[in-house]
Amino acid sequence: MRLCGFEAGLQHPFFLMAGPCAIESESLALRTAEDLRDICARLGIPFIYKSSYDKANRSSGQSFRGPGMDEGLRILEKVRREVGVPVVTDVHEKEDVSAVAEVVDVLQTPAFLCRQTDFIQAVAAAGKPVNIKKGQFLAPWDMLHVASKAKATGNEQIMVCERGASFGYNNLVSDMRSLAVMRQTGCPVVFDATHSVQLPGGQGDRSGGQREFIPVLARAAVAAGVSGLFMETHPNPADALSDGPNAWPLGRMEDLLRILQHIDHVVKNQDFPENYPEELV
């Protein structure tokens, strides 16, 4: 699949979607985007900047949600123009799709909304590439139906994203088999290495996270074979206004990406027999 000027798929090196969870300020957005751009340029990794203008599904009504659509899109447009990188953000309402699609290069749908047929099709109908996050409550094979709904609009630029599955209360687990299963959609598969270590509602009025396991799951996902990685990062995760406990420190991003590149290179120089189970008899 052609995505933001590069090729995305198992035949190609992984791409990266990364940035702070929420847009906290213009200066933070620009600085983080510049740092990530430079890191990815040194490593030769295709990069799309990610940040959200509104976190509509925070645990508490008192939690920081972001600057709102108008200010958030202004900042994302400035990042796109001044830093020179494509941008992705999530959209939560059908009514917002057209305005957001005018600014960003990739649209993302939240995991909680993946079963909302009208919403998924409204986002896909905008004609931009779409990253559909799999709900924590959904089996990986059920994403075939979600992807089919999106493609029914005529948009073939659809990606599917694994971000963990509910494992009892306040916990998620990542089943690496899901990455192979979701390839059956015919879409590039993305692994969200940071939300997968989230502990939803684990701090009472907010979500917790186990940041130390981000490299573990990222290495496993790349070894399983993915087209892209999604990682939320922050210069100071402890000070992040949203999802700090499961954000990877920006200062450690380059070292982690180097390791993941080595794994990706080895894995993609071999066949993926799991793609042809009928031959394994």
UniProtKB/Swiss-Prot annotation:
Q: Which family does it belong to?
A: Belongs to the KdsA family.
User: What InterPro entries does its record include?
Assistant: Aldolase_TIM, DAHP1/KDSA, KDO8P_synthase
Q: What are the protein's GO molecular function terms? A: 3-deoxy-8-phosphooctulonate synthase activity
Protein origin, superkingdom: Bacteria
Q: Where does this polypeptide localize?
A: Cytoplasm
This protein's pathway = Carbohydrate biosynthesis; 3-deoxy-D-manno-octulosonate biosynthesis; 3-deoxy-D-manno-octulosonate from D-ribulose 5-phosphate: step 2/3; Bacterial outer membrane biogenesis; lipopolysaccharide biosynthesis
What protein does this entry describe? 2-dehydro-3-deoxyphosphooctonate aldolase
Q: For this protein, what is the EC number?
A: 2.5.1.55
HAMAP family reported for this sequence: KDO8P_synth
Its cellular-component GO annotations read:
cytoplasm
Please name the source species: Acidithiobacillus ferrooxidans (strain ATCC 23270 / DSM 14882 / CIP 104768 / NCIMB 8455) (Ferrobacillus ferrooxidans (strain ATCC 23270))
Keyword entries, A-Z = Cytoplasm, Lipopolysaccharide biosynthesis, Transferase
The catalysed reaction is: D-arabinose 5-phosphate + phosphoenolpyruvate + H2O = 3-deoxy-alpha-D-manno-2-octulosonate-8-phosphate + phosphate
Q: What's the name of its gene?
A: kdsA
**Pfam families attached here?**
DAHP_synth_1
Q: Which GO terms describe its biological process?
A: keto-3-deoxy-D-manno-octulosonic acid biosynthetic process
